[in-house]
Design a protein with these regions (language model features):
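Charged, amphipathic alpha-helical segments
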Residues: 161-169, 223-228, 239, 347-359
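Beta-strand elements of modular eukaryotic interaction domains
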Residues: 81-85, 93-96, 104-106, 173-175, ...
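Extended C-terminal subregions enriched in glycine
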Residues: 345-378
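Aspartyl protease active-site motif detector
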Residues: 92-142, 184, 202, 218-222, ...
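Glycine-rich flap/beta-hairpin and adjacent strands of clan AA aspartyl proteases
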Residues: 168-281, 371, 377-431
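Disordered propeptide/prodomain
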Residues: 2-106, 114-178, 198, 230-231, ...
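Beta-strand-rich binding-surface signature
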Residues: 90-94, 103-107, 114, 164-166, ...
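Typically disulfide-stabilized, N-glycosylated extracellular/lumenal ectodomains of secreted
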Residues: 263-264, 292-301, 305-307, 401
Length: 435
Protein backbone atom coordinates (compact mmCIF):
# COMPACT_ATOMS: atom_id res chain seq x y z
CA UNK A 1 0.00 0.00 0.00
CA UNK A 2 2.96 2.35 0.59
CA UNK A 3 3.96 2.03 -3.07
CA UNK A 4 0.42 2.81 -4.18
CA UNK A 5 0.09 5.75 -1.82
CA UNK A 6 3.36 7.22 -3.10
CA UNK A 7 1.78 7.67 -6.53
CA UNK A 8 -0.45 10.37 -5.10
CA UNK A 9 2.05 12.38 -3.05
CA UNK A 10 1.93 16.11 -3.62
CA UNK A 11 5.10 18.10 -4.08
CA UNK A 12 5.98 20.27 -1.08
CA UNK A 13 8.99 22.08 -2.50
CA UNK A 14 8.62 25.12 -4.72
CA UNK A 15 7.62 24.19 -8.27
CA UNK A 16 10.07 26.76 -9.60
CA UNK A 17 12.90 24.65 -8.20
CA UNK A 18 11.54 21.26 -9.19
CA UNK A 19 10.00 21.68 -12.62
CA UNK A 20 11.04 22.93 -16.01
CA UNK A 21 8.93 23.80 -19.05
CA UNK A 22 9.44 22.13 -22.41
CA UNK A 23 10.55 24.78 -24.87
CA UNK A 24 12.93 23.39 -27.48
CA UNK A 25 12.46 20.70 -30.10
CA UNK A 26 15.42 18.83 -28.60
CA UNK A 27 13.60 18.20 -25.32
CA UNK A 28 13.20 14.62 -24.17
CA UNK A 29 11.79 12.91 -21.11
CA UNK A 30 10.55 9.52 -19.91
CA UNK A 31 7.64 8.52 -17.67
CA UNK A 32 6.85 5.29 -15.85
CA UNK A 33 3.97 3.23 -17.18
CA UNK A 34 2.30 1.06 -14.56
CA UNK A 35 0.62 -2.12 -15.73
CA UNK A 36 -2.77 -2.34 -14.08
CA UNK A 37 -1.90 -5.80 -12.68
CA UNK A 38 1.47 -4.71 -11.26
CA UNK A 39 2.01 -4.49 -7.47
CA UNK A 40 2.56 -0.76 -8.13
CA UNK A 41 -1.03 -0.42 -9.35
CA UNK A 42 -4.13 0.36 -7.26
CA UNK A 43 -5.83 -2.49 -9.14
CA UNK A 44 -3.38 -5.02 -7.71
CA UNK A 45 -5.02 -7.72 -5.61
CA UNK A 46 -2.46 -9.67 -3.60
CA UNK A 47 -5.00 -12.42 -2.91
CA UNK A 48 -5.20 -13.30 -6.62
CA UNK A 49 -2.71 -15.69 -8.18
CA UNK A 50 -0.63 -14.72 -11.19
CA UNK A 51 -2.75 -17.06 -13.30
CA UNK A 52 -6.03 -15.46 -12.19
CA UNK A 53 -4.62 -12.02 -13.01
CA UNK A 54 -3.47 -13.21 -16.44
CA UNK A 55 -6.88 -14.71 -17.24
CA UNK A 56 -8.55 -11.41 -16.35
CA UNK A 57 -6.15 -9.61 -18.69
CA UNK A 58 -7.05 -12.00 -21.51
CA UNK A 59 -10.77 -11.44 -20.92
CA UNK A 60 -10.24 -7.66 -21.06
CA UNK A 61 -8.32 -8.15 -24.29
CA UNK A 62 -11.20 -10.11 -25.79
CA UNK A 63 -13.72 -7.44 -24.74
CA UNK A 64 -11.58 -4.63 -26.08
CA UNK A 65 -10.98 -6.23 -29.47
CA UNK A 66 -14.68 -7.02 -29.90
CA UNK A 67 -15.64 -3.37 -29.33
CA UNK A 68 -12.99 -1.74 -31.50
CA UNK A 69 -15.30 -1.22 -34.44
CA UNK A 70 -18.70 -1.41 -32.77
CA UNK A 71 -21.01 1.01 -34.66
CA UNK A 72 -23.19 3.39 -32.65
CA UNK A 73 -26.20 5.40 -33.72
CA UNK A 74 -25.97 9.15 -33.32
CA UNK A 75 -27.46 10.49 -30.12
CA UNK A 76 -28.29 13.86 -28.69
CA UNK A 77 -26.10 15.63 -27.83
CA UNK A 78 -23.80 14.60 -30.71
CA UNK A 79 -21.15 12.12 -29.66
CA UNK A 80 -17.66 11.26 -30.72
CA UNK A 81 -17.69 7.48 -31.06
CA UNK A 82 -14.55 5.99 -29.56
CA UNK A 83 -13.61 2.54 -30.84
CA UNK A 84 -11.97 1.40 -27.62
CA UNK A 85 -13.59 -0.19 -24.61
CA UNK A 86 -13.35 2.19 -21.68
CA UNK A 87 -12.40 -0.28 -18.99
CA UNK A 88 -9.60 -2.17 -20.75
CA UNK A 89 -6.62 0.18 -20.71
CA UNK A 90 -3.72 -2.03 -19.57
CA UNK A 91 -1.29 0.72 -18.59
CA UNK A 92 -1.66 3.59 -16.13
CA UNK A 93 0.21 6.88 -16.25
CA UNK A 94 0.53 9.52 -13.55
CA UNK A 95 -0.36 13.04 -14.66
CA UNK A 96 -0.67 16.26 -12.66
CA UNK A 97 -3.17 18.84 -13.88
CA UNK A 98 -3.51 22.55 -13.12
CA UNK A 99 -1.69 25.17 -11.05
CA UNK A 100 -1.06 24.15 -8.34
CA UNK A 101 -0.94 20.63 -9.82
CA UNK A 102 -3.32 17.90 -8.68
CA UNK A 103 -2.26 14.28 -9.22
CA UNK A 104 -4.27 11.72 -11.18
CA UNK A 105 -3.73 8.18 -12.43
CA UNK A 106 -5.12 7.76 -15.95
CA UNK A 107 -5.19 4.96 -18.51
CA UNK A 108 -2.57 5.63 -21.20
CA UNK A 109 -3.62 4.24 -24.55
CA UNK A 110 -2.67 4.36 -28.24
CA UNK A 111 -6.29 3.56 -29.13
CA UNK A 112 -7.77 6.78 -27.69
CA UNK A 113 -7.42 10.41 -28.71
CA UNK A 114 -9.04 12.67 -26.11
CA UNK A 115 -7.25 13.13 -22.78
CA UNK A 116 -9.82 13.76 -20.05
CA UNK A 117 -10.45 13.76 -16.31
CA UNK A 118 -13.56 14.39 -14.21
CA UNK A 119 -14.17 18.00 -13.17
CA UNK A 120 -16.32 20.03 -10.80
CA UNK A 121 -19.16 20.82 -10.94
CA UNK A 122 -19.83 17.11 -11.26
CA UNK A 123 -23.34 16.71 -12.63
CA UNK A 124 -23.09 12.95 -13.05
CA UNK A 125 -19.77 11.34 -12.18
CA UNK A 126 -18.45 7.96 -11.15
CA UNK A 127 -16.63 7.51 -7.86
CA UNK A 128 -12.85 7.96 -7.98
CA UNK A 129 -10.26 7.63 -5.22
CA UNK A 130 -8.56 10.97 -5.85
CA UNK A 131 -10.20 14.40 -5.43
CA UNK A 132 -12.10 15.57 -8.49
CA UNK A 133 -10.41 18.44 -10.33
CA UNK A 134 -11.84 21.88 -9.58
CA UNK A 135 -11.08 24.34 -12.43
CA UNK A 136 -11.80 27.30 -10.14
CA UNK A 137 -8.82 26.36 -7.98
CA UNK A 138 -6.36 26.43 -10.89
CA UNK A 139 -4.78 29.69 -12.06
CA UNK A 140 -3.97 28.27 -15.52
CA UNK A 141 -7.36 26.79 -16.48
CA UNK A 142 -9.16 28.27 -19.51
CA UNK A 143 -12.23 27.16 -21.44
CA UNK A 144 -11.76 26.81 -25.18
CA UNK A 145 -14.13 29.14 -27.07
CA UNK A 146 -16.20 27.84 -29.97
CA UNK A 147 -14.02 29.89 -32.34
CA UNK A 148 -10.83 28.07 -31.33
CA UNK A 149 -9.03 25.97 -33.91
CA UNK A 150 -9.58 22.77 -31.94
CA UNK A 151 -13.36 23.21 -31.77
CA UNK A 152 -14.31 21.51 -35.01
CA UNK A 153 -16.70 18.68 -35.78
CA UNK A 154 -17.45 16.34 -34.15
CA UNK A 155 -16.90 18.69 -31.19
CA UNK A 156 -19.78 21.07 -30.58
CA UNK A 157 -20.49 24.61 -29.39
CA UNK A 158 -22.29 24.76 -26.06
CA UNK A 159 -23.52 27.32 -23.57
CA UNK A 160 -21.49 30.49 -22.96
CA UNK A 161 -19.79 30.01 -26.34
CA UNK A 162 -17.58 27.23 -24.90
CA UNK A 163 -16.42 24.19 -26.87
CA UNK A 164 -18.01 20.94 -25.65
CA UNK A 165 -17.51 17.23 -26.21
CA UNK A 166 -19.67 14.15 -25.75
CA UNK A 167 -17.69 10.93 -26.03
CA UNK A 168 -19.16 7.41 -26.07
CA UNK A 169 -16.99 4.29 -25.84
CA UNK A 170 -17.61 0.97 -27.51
CA UNK A 171 -18.97 -0.59 -24.31
CA UNK A 172 -21.49 2.20 -23.75
CA UNK A 173 -19.43 4.11 -21.17
CA UNK A 174 -19.40 7.85 -21.72
CA UNK A 175 -17.90 11.20 -20.76
CA UNK A 176 -19.22 14.70 -21.50
CA UNK A 177 -17.87 18.13 -20.67
CA UNK A 178 -15.82 21.11 -21.81
CA UNK A 179 -12.78 21.21 -24.08
CA UNK A 180 -10.36 23.33 -22.07
CA UNK A 181 -6.73 24.42 -21.82
CA UNK A 182 -4.58 23.58 -18.83
CA UNK A 183 -1.01 23.00 -17.68
CA UNK A 184 0.02 19.36 -17.37
CA UNK A 185 2.92 18.20 -15.21
CA UNK A 186 4.64 14.88 -15.87
CA UNK A 187 6.77 13.16 -13.22
CA UNK A 188 9.76 11.91 -15.18
CA UNK A 189 12.13 9.04 -14.47
CA UNK A 190 14.96 11.57 -14.03
CA UNK A 191 13.17 12.89 -10.94
CA UNK A 192 12.59 16.35 -12.40
CA UNK A 193 8.95 17.00 -13.40
CA UNK A 194 8.19 18.52 -16.78
CA UNK A 195 5.49 21.18 -17.14
CA UNK A 196 3.65 21.52 -20.46
CA UNK A 197 1.30 24.52 -20.69
CA UNK A 198 -1.88 24.88 -22.76
CA UNK A 199 -2.81 21.24 -23.28
CA UNK A 200 -6.31 20.81 -24.73
CA UNK A 201 -8.18 18.24 -22.67
CA UNK A 202 -11.66 17.16 -21.71
CA UNK A 203 -12.92 18.55 -18.41
CA UNK A 204 -15.73 16.07 -17.81
CA UNK A 205 -18.87 17.01 -15.90
CA UNK A 206 -20.64 13.76 -16.75
CA UNK A 207 -19.15 10.27 -16.90
CA UNK A 208 -20.52 6.80 -16.35
CA UNK A 209 -20.70 3.21 -17.43
CA UNK A 210 -17.85 0.83 -16.68
CA UNK A 211 -15.32 3.30 -15.32
CA UNK A 212 -14.08 2.54 -11.81
CA UNK A 213 -12.60 4.35 -8.83
CA UNK A 214 -8.98 3.45 -9.60
CA UNK A 215 -8.75 5.20 -13.00
CA UNK A 216 -9.22 8.96 -13.00
CA UNK A 217 -9.46 9.39 -16.77
CA UNK A 218 -7.64 8.65 -20.02
CA UNK A 219 -4.44 9.92 -21.64
CA UNK A 220 -4.99 9.80 -25.40
CA UNK A 221 -1.95 8.61 -27.35
CA UNK A 222 -3.86 7.91 -30.56
CA UNK A 223 -3.28 9.32 -34.02
CA UNK A 224 -5.59 12.34 -34.14
CA UNK A 225 -5.31 16.10 -33.65
CA UNK A 226 -6.92 15.84 -30.20
CA UNK A 227 -4.37 13.38 -28.83
CA UNK A 228 -1.72 14.59 -26.44
CA UNK A 229 0.91 13.14 -28.78
CA UNK A 230 -0.13 15.40 -31.64
CA UNK A 231 -0.44 18.41 -29.33
CA UNK A 232 3.19 17.86 -28.27
CA UNK A 233 4.26 17.03 -31.81
CA UNK A 234 6.51 20.05 -32.42
CA UNK A 235 7.94 19.97 -28.92
CA UNK A 236 8.90 16.29 -29.01
CA UNK A 237 9.95 16.22 -32.66
CA UNK A 238 6.99 13.95 -33.34
CA UNK A 239 8.59 11.05 -31.47
CA UNK A 240 7.42 8.80 -28.65
CA UNK A 241 8.30 5.25 -27.65
CA UNK A 242 7.49 2.66 -25.02
CA UNK A 243 9.28 -0.34 -23.58
CA UNK A 244 7.05 -2.91 -21.88
CA UNK A 245 8.47 -5.28 -19.28
CA UNK A 246 7.37 -8.94 -18.90
CA UNK A 247 4.19 -9.49 -16.91
CA UNK A 248 5.93 -11.02 -13.88
CA UNK A 249 8.33 -8.08 -13.48
CA UNK A 250 7.95 -5.61 -10.61
CA UNK A 251 9.81 -2.94 -12.59
CA UNK A 252 7.57 -0.37 -14.35
CA UNK A 253 7.45 -0.07 -18.11
CA UNK A 254 8.38 3.29 -19.63
CA UNK A 255 7.05 5.73 -22.20
CA UNK A 256 9.47 8.28 -23.64
CA UNK A 257 9.12 11.46 -25.67
CA UNK A 258 11.34 13.58 -27.92
CA UNK A 259 15.07 12.86 -27.89
CA UNK A 260 14.54 10.12 -25.28
CA UNK A 261 12.29 8.28 -27.74
CA UNK A 262 14.82 7.83 -30.55
CA UNK A 263 15.24 4.14 -31.44
CA UNK A 264 18.66 3.52 -32.95
CA UNK A 265 21.60 1.13 -33.03
CA UNK A 266 22.12 -2.48 -33.99
CA UNK A 267 19.03 -4.57 -34.65
CA UNK A 268 16.52 -1.78 -35.28
CA UNK A 269 13.70 -2.68 -37.68
CA UNK A 270 11.48 0.03 -39.18
CA UNK A 271 8.16 -0.12 -40.94
CA UNK A 272 5.80 2.62 -42.14
CA UNK A 273 2.56 3.23 -40.28
CA UNK A 274 -0.67 4.25 -41.97
CA UNK A 275 -3.72 6.22 -40.94
CA UNK A 276 -7.34 6.07 -41.98
CA UNK A 277 -9.97 8.79 -42.11
CA UNK A 278 -11.58 9.42 -38.70
CA UNK A 279 -9.60 6.56 -37.12
CA UNK A 280 -7.33 6.83 -34.10
CA UNK A 281 -5.19 3.80 -34.75
CA UNK A 282 -1.70 3.23 -36.07
CA UNK A 283 -1.89 0.66 -38.88
CA UNK A 284 1.05 -1.39 -40.12
CA UNK A 285 1.28 -3.45 -43.31
CA UNK A 286 1.80 -7.13 -42.50
CA UNK A 287 3.15 -9.01 -45.50
CA UNK A 288 3.54 -12.50 -44.02
CA UNK A 289 4.28 -14.57 -40.92
CA UNK A 290 7.02 -17.19 -40.72
CA UNK A 291 6.69 -20.15 -38.34
CA UNK A 292 9.98 -22.01 -38.22
CA UNK A 293 10.81 -22.42 -41.92
CA UNK A 294 7.28 -22.01 -43.27
CA UNK A 295 6.20 -18.61 -44.58
CA UNK A 296 2.48 -17.76 -44.78
CA UNK A 297 1.40 -14.73 -46.77
CA UNK A 298 -1.16 -12.47 -45.13
CA UNK A 299 -4.06 -12.92 -47.54
CA UNK A 300 -7.65 -12.85 -46.29
CA UNK A 301 -11.10 -12.01 -47.61
CA UNK A 302 -10.53 -8.42 -46.44
CA UNK A 303 -6.88 -7.91 -47.37
CA UNK A 304 -5.32 -9.01 -50.64
CA UNK A 305 -1.71 -8.39 -49.51
CA UNK A 306 -1.39 -5.73 -52.18
CA UNK A 307 1.74 -3.70 -51.45
CA UNK A 308 0.05 -0.69 -53.01
CA UNK A 309 -2.55 -0.56 -50.23
CA UNK A 310 -2.22 2.79 -48.47
CA UNK A 311 -4.04 2.16 -45.23
CA UNK A 312 -2.25 -0.85 -43.70
CA UNK A 313 -3.86 -4.09 -42.59
CA UNK A 314 -3.07 -4.59 -38.89
CA UNK A 315 -3.42 -2.27 -35.89
CA UNK A 316 -0.52 -1.99 -33.45
CA UNK A 317 -2.10 -1.49 -30.03
CA UNK A 318 -0.59 -1.16 -26.56
CA UNK A 319 -3.92 -1.74 -24.81
CA UNK A 320 -4.77 -5.17 -26.26
CA UNK A 321 -3.04 -8.10 -24.56
CA UNK A 322 -3.15 -10.71 -27.33
CA UNK A 323 -2.49 -10.55 -31.05
CA UNK A 324 -5.63 -11.14 -33.11
CA UNK A 325 -5.57 -12.38 -36.69
CA UNK A 326 -8.50 -12.80 -39.12
CA UNK A 327 -9.95 -16.26 -38.55
CA UNK A 328 -8.93 -17.88 -41.84
CA UNK A 329 -5.36 -16.59 -41.58
CA UNK A 330 -5.10 -17.45 -37.89
CA UNK A 331 -6.06 -21.04 -38.68
CA UNK A 332 -3.17 -21.32 -41.15
CA UNK A 333 -0.77 -19.98 -38.51
CA UNK A 334 -2.10 -22.30 -35.80
CA UNK A 335 -1.96 -25.35 -38.08
CA UNK A 336 1.66 -24.67 -39.00
CA UNK A 337 2.56 -24.03 -35.36
CA UNK A 338 1.08 -27.41 -34.36
CA UNK A 339 2.99 -29.14 -37.17
CA UNK A 340 6.23 -27.71 -35.80
CA UNK A 341 5.75 -29.24 -32.35
CA UNK A 342 5.79 -32.97 -31.60
CA UNK A 343 3.89 -32.58 -28.31
CA UNK A 344 0.15 -33.19 -28.28
CA UNK A 345 -2.07 -30.17 -27.50
CA UNK A 346 -4.23 -30.21 -24.36
CA UNK A 347 -7.56 -28.54 -23.62
CA UNK A 348 -7.60 -24.79 -24.28
CA UNK A 349 -8.43 -21.94 -21.90
CA UNK A 350 -11.07 -19.29 -22.64
CA UNK A 351 -10.23 -17.97 -26.11
CA UNK A 352 -6.75 -19.49 -26.06
CA UNK A 353 -7.55 -22.62 -28.01
CA UNK A 354 -4.02 -24.01 -28.49
CA UNK A 355 -2.33 -25.14 -25.27
CA UNK A 356 0.40 -27.59 -24.23
CA UNK A 357 1.83 -29.12 -21.09
CA UNK A 358 5.03 -27.33 -20.18
CA UNK A 359 7.06 -30.50 -19.90
CA UNK A 360 10.84 -30.62 -19.83
CA UNK A 361 12.25 -29.55 -23.18
CA UNK A 362 8.96 -28.23 -24.52
CA UNK A 363 10.07 -24.60 -24.81
CA UNK A 364 12.96 -25.70 -27.03
CA UNK A 365 10.37 -27.16 -29.42
CA UNK A 366 8.54 -23.85 -29.83
CA UNK A 367 9.38 -22.51 -33.29
CA UNK A 368 10.55 -18.96 -33.87
CA UNK A 369 7.75 -16.82 -35.25
CA UNK A 370 8.58 -13.76 -37.34
CA UNK A 371 6.14 -11.04 -38.34
CA UNK A 372 7.23 -9.57 -41.67
CA UNK A 373 6.08 -5.98 -41.95
CA UNK A 374 6.88 -3.78 -44.94
CA UNK A 375 10.56 -2.86 -44.54
CA UNK A 376 11.08 -4.59 -41.19
CA UNK A 377 10.81 -7.96 -39.46
CA UNK A 378 10.05 -8.67 -35.80
CA UNK A 379 11.21 -12.02 -34.47
CA UNK A 380 9.22 -13.31 -31.50
CA UNK A 381 10.69 -15.37 -28.68
CA UNK A 382 8.85 -17.91 -26.52
CA UNK A 383 8.09 -15.02 -24.15
CA UNK A 384 6.11 -13.35 -26.96
CA UNK A 385 4.32 -16.43 -28.24
CA UNK A 386 3.39 -18.55 -25.21
CA UNK A 387 1.55 -17.61 -21.99
CA UNK A 388 1.70 -19.73 -18.85
CA UNK A 389 -2.02 -19.78 -18.15
CA UNK A 390 -1.67 -22.15 -15.17
CA UNK A 391 1.13 -24.05 -13.51
CA UNK A 392 2.61 -26.38 -16.12
CA UNK A 393 0.37 -25.22 -18.97
CA UNK A 394 1.41 -22.91 -21.83
CA UNK A 395 -1.01 -21.45 -24.39
CA UNK A 396 -0.44 -19.80 -27.76
CA UNK A 397 -0.72 -16.02 -27.24
CA UNK A 398 -2.68 -15.30 -30.41
CA UNK A 399 -6.34 -15.73 -31.25
CA UNK A 400 -8.77 -15.44 -34.17
CA UNK A 401 -10.63 -12.16 -34.50
CA UNK A 402 -12.42 -9.99 -37.01
CA UNK A 403 -9.81 -7.23 -36.90
CA UNK A 404 -6.05 -7.82 -37.11
CA UNK A 405 -4.40 -6.39 -33.97
CA UNK A 406 -0.75 -6.66 -32.93
CA UNK A 407 -1.01 -6.84 -29.13
CA UNK A 408 1.24 -6.00 -26.22
CA UNK A 409 2.41 -9.55 -25.40
CA UNK A 410 4.15 -9.59 -28.78
CA UNK A 411 5.62 -6.13 -28.03
CA UNK A 412 7.01 -7.12 -24.61
CA UNK A 413 10.79 -6.76 -24.15
CA UNK A 414 10.92 -4.59 -27.25
CA UNK A 415 11.55 -0.87 -27.60
CA UNK A 416 8.73 0.36 -29.85
CA UNK A 417 9.16 3.85 -31.29
CA UNK A 418 6.73 6.03 -33.23
CA UNK A 419 7.96 8.82 -35.50
CA UNK A 420 5.05 11.01 -36.59
CA UNK A 421 7.23 13.02 -38.99
CA UNK A 422 8.68 10.01 -40.83
CA UNK A 423 5.44 8.02 -40.30
CA UNK A 424 7.34 4.96 -39.12
CA UNK A 425 7.24 2.50 -36.23
CA UNK A 426 10.59 1.07 -35.08
CA UNK A 427 11.27 -2.14 -33.16
CA UNK A 428 14.39 -3.07 -31.21
CA UNK A 429 14.66 -6.10 -28.94
CA UNK A 430 15.47 -4.65 -25.51
CA UNK A 431 15.66 -5.67 -21.87
CA UNK A 432 13.00 -3.20 -20.78
CA UNK A 433 13.68 -3.88 -17.08
CA UNK A 434 17.00 -2.06 -17.57
CA UNK A 435 15.89 0.53 -20.12
Amino acid sequence: MELISSLFLCFTISLSLLTFPIQSRSSGFSINLIHRDSPLSPYYNSSMSYYEILRNSIRRSMTRSSHMFTPKLASSPPTIQSPLTAVTGEYLMKISVGTPPLDFLAAADTGSDLTWIQCKPCIECYQQNTPIFDPKRSSTYRNQPCQSKVCQKPLSCGDKNFCNYAFTYGDGSYTEGDISLESFTFETTSGKPVVVPNISFGCGHKAGGNFDKFTDGIVGLGNSDLSIINQLRNTINGKFSYCMVPSKSNVPSKISFGSNAIVSGYGVQRTPFFTRDQQLYYYLFLESVTIGEANIKFVTETYSNNANDKDGNIIIDSGTTLTYLPSEFYQLVEDEFKRSISSTPVEGEDELTLCYKNEEGFEKEVPTITFHFTGGNLELSVLNTMLEIEDGKLCFAMAPGGTAIFGNVQQTSCLVGYDLEAKTVSFKKTDCTKY
